[in-house]
């Protein structure tokens, strides 16, 4: 199959990629054996339309790094960014403690321009539902925040939490993992954020996911696979299955 963009007249747009891209373990499968680290992002972005950056959880890159990311990727590429642990694990969404970190995060991400995609706030498993805290935190977010929330404690899976997210225009992240019960696939915003974290997906699994995502009614859908060597192929296959039900923004390699 050629690298041309493929699309469909349906309203949804599916963006599929991996959690990270700079893995030497991908050499010989996704990357050429002799690829240099500085060439990986360009290679990746020629084949997939989005990437989830996780190391921002530990440290926010300098603006010069963000500028280089933007320059190394084609028009239409999107970076999903995991929010700093200072916000989610240290401040634990307490607005008065997290305010400066939230402002710093979004100020820096503006460097990416239109290539900035969603911002993922991944909460620790020990943090239980606290609706007043969540509501106050949501008021901190800037306009056009594009925020997704991954709750890893089941107490958060409740209608009043979904209502708070809807009111703020934030999305409930669906995360499929081996070690927990995933949340329901509840649309709380016009766009969806899905993390598929199982080690193995069959073609049938991916086809079922494409159908399920199309049925959710989102205008845009971001999907990220775990950072295994199989992740790029899973993302490409999901986009191929999505052609029949969603407009695919991306490039499919031969």
Features from the language model and the residues they span:
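Residues lining hydrophobic/aromatic ligand-binding pockets adjacent to catalytic sites
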Residues: 1-254
